[in-house]
Amino acid sequence: MPLLTVNNLKVERGGISVLEIPLFSLNEGETLAILGPNGAGKTTFLLTLARLLGYIQGKLFFKGEDISLPERTVPYRRRLAMVFQEPLLLNTTVFNNVAAGLKIRRMKKKEIEKRISKYAELVNIRHLLNRDARKLSGGEAQRTNLARAFATEPELILLDEPFANLDAPSCDSLIDDLYRILRQTETTAILATHNRLEALRLADRLAVMDAGKIVQMGASNEVMNYPVNEVVASFVGMEAVFSGCVQTVCGGSFVASVAGHAIMALGDVKAGEKVICCIRPENIIISRDSAMEGTSVRNNLPAKIVKIIPRGPFFKIDLDCGFFLASYVTQQSLENLSLMEGKDVTVSFKATAVHVIRREKRC
């Protein structure tokens, strides 16, 4: 039995639908990441699941129990915890902040101290327990927020962009610790984020939201590599998304015409059919000549470098092949290939690197 199930959920604001979830289920012990741009409905969905936001239609079930009924709202809320982007700490010590939820539950002093000791250790804030919460760094404050949530030992924890305001080192460290804590405590979690790297590091499954709807949900690898439409493809990192017309089909492979180029890919398509092709930047190889010809790489195209953009330890290379492509290279590759804006190069990618979305329309 799923831990949480949603049926025909609908939320409106000012008479306008902002959230429509026909069917949703969450398994006990799993971590689900909800990806989507700002305004996609991620926070609205979490607030609705927490019963902190009303809805005009639908049913929510927690362990098979209908929690849509008003009299079950408070008991249900006590079984979950929610962590927001802002820590919202009380004007007191870290110890008292972590103890807040336990005191509301009227736990005994010894049990409170035991819980705080356990979760302060897990979240690495034991040395901060006597500190004034107002003097914490952003990372320390969010760790305190997480300790407060986990100390109640919730059956479900909802995480709404918890890393959004942190610097990169604090974010990386906290994500690693959160992954460890979720696995160690076997707590079921839903993470709302617009950062696909955070989602991949933490989640067993991914859901992608757009305009208040879940447009795709599945195993992380499935969603990342097999998006169902252009919106999902762009959001999960397939920066090159372009349309083509299938010319010839042979077995499980085909050749599509794209801006005058013949692109080989794999897929169950028909000649004359329109398709959307998606390629990840890491699957695009740049060379100064046709060096990849004669290898297993089937697609070799002339291209011009349009823009070079620093991306941490890598550089993103925007390319014009008559259609847009992008690639990532290291500093060493950038120098070895003498890459610069305006330079003509050859781009290569395997037929297996192309993810195909069928349009089921004729060219």
Regions found by a protein language model. Give the residues of each.
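ABC ATPase NBD coupling module
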Residues: 66-81, 104, 227
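Conserved ABC ATPase signature
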Residues: 132-136, 140
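The feature captures the beta-strand-to-loop junction immediately N-terminal to the Walker
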Residues: 35-37
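Helix-to-loop junction immediately C-terminal to a conserved catalytic motif
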Residues: 50
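Glycine/charge-rich catalytic "coupling/switch" loops of P-loop NTPases
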Residues: 260-308, 328-363
